[in-house]
């Protein structure tokens, strides 16, 4: 019931409630500039650093990510993937964009300032989970040149989008990836019989 009430709130109000609820935890937790305050983590759960390491290993082992690749993080959030990648992409480049300004600001201050090969951009996109106004994701052009990246990641992004928005993001990803580039993405699997899909 509380979850239903929470998601009935506007995206801006949900972020405010989250900051308020986690304020005591954030106030008394030891400060670690590799982990954002809990009140700012607007998506994902579990151990922040462990999740970043887990996905970095997946990108390397299953996707073939190389230390000198140019990587695009579609929906970079509050830097969960980026923090895990900082120890691996030593000679590569990382570009991430997201629609939540607080997340991008945190990443610029705590990651980009220490790792100049990691860049974060705020994009004014509309998304019913995070922001009720902005550019329509179905017409959004990624702010990067054609044939620029070797590797793109999109973890838990397409699960928050509508099919016509996903189609545009896939087209933009294809445009910005070099020939032979890799997209490592997560999706929901829709089965004909969801009850017995397991």
Residue ranges and their predicted role:
Residues 2-62, 78-85, 93-141, 168, ...:
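Class I (Rossmann-like) S-adenosyl-L-methionine-dependent methyltransferase catalytic domain
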Residues 162-163:
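Helix-capping/helix-break motifs at membrane-protein junctions
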Residues 167-179:
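A short glycine-rich, Lys/Arg-flanked "PGG" loop and its adjoining helix->strand segment in the class I
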Residues 70, 181-182:
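Short glycine-centered segments of the SAM/dcSAM-binding site in methyltransferase folds
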